[in-house]
Amino acid sequence: MSADFRHEPVLANEILELLRPRPGELFLDGTLGGGGHSGLLLEAGARVIALDKDPRALAAATARLARFGEAFRAVRSDFRDAKNVLEALGIAAVDGALVDLGVSSPQLDEAERGFSFSRPGPLDMRMGDTGETLEDLLRRIDERELARILREYGEEPFARPVARAVKAALETEAPLDTARLAEVVAGAIPRKAWPHRIHPATRTFQALRIAVNDELGALAAWLDGLPGVLAPGGRAAAISFHSLEDRMVKEKFRALTQACTCPPDLPVCACGAKASFAAITRKAVKASDEEIARNPRARSARLRAVEKLR
């Protein structure tokens, strides 16, 4: 296997502690990537069905994990379709489910994928090789919609001037690559407002990547599908890397673990409802200082987990 897709799984020890894989149990890894988390589960004796949209990641991870034989199966699919994939395979439920919502290092580092602003690459940003590219998106939407995307998905305070500058550059400069796009974005933000620790285009690139891949829609679908995917006693874990994702996971997990559905002004519960899930993590689990020193990209990782009760 090419070394390009080898990566150190984030929060590896914490994942094993929370998911507690046992020999023979079946797990669903919704974001195979370099195969790091799937490898952890397989090493513990579990069986794994893994999904990924990226054919290169699938090929590389499949080669890496081939030694586990029939215990490992990779499927080219978006994790939003996890339930459909399991049904197609004749599987009613799994003992655990995991998603790692970060972009893999190879995707970030390969200029031709269009995720990096440090080197020139095409305006692509697709996790797979199908669907609308970033350039397609930028040409299809107007300045107002672009500003909304930057504000909502990137929490960019200068969304309007950035959107204006990007649309203007798209019309006057051809071809526009990722390095030049980053320069355009940075130029639209007052230098005194540049973030201290990240490139000024980071928020914009995050927002555009989320929009191109409908990442929040995929996460919402995965979260909504958990009750129908997990067997009783099954555990689910999600690793997020920015506040939008973490907020979605936190709110959905909270909703799953709540029992009473009565209006908040009722003094006594009248519905008699019982929670179908229990929280495993009371707050987000973060990487240790040692892991961050070894893998700086783990700094923003947030892990939350729940267990299905019935």
UniProtKB/Swiss-Prot annotation:
GO CC, any one term: cytoplasm
Broad enzyme group: transferase
Listed GO MF terms: rRNA (cytosine-N4-)-methyltransferase activity
Principal subcellular localization: cytoplasm
Subcellular localization(s) per the UniProt record: Cytoplasm
Reaction equations catalysed: cytidine(1402) in 16S rRNA + S-adenosyl-L-methionine = N(4)-methylcytidine(1402) in 16S rRNA + S-adenosyl-L-homocysteine + H(+)
Purpose: Specifically methylates the N4 position of cytidine in position 1402 (C1402) of 16S rRNA.
PANTHER family: 12S RRNA N4-METHYLCYTIDINE METHYLTRANSFERASE (PTHR11265:SF0), S-ADENOSYL-METHYLTRANSFERASE MRAW (PTHR11265)
Family statement drawn from the similarity comment of this UniProt entry: Belongs to the methyltransferase superfamily. RsmH family.
Protein name: Ribosomal RNA small subunit methyltransferase H
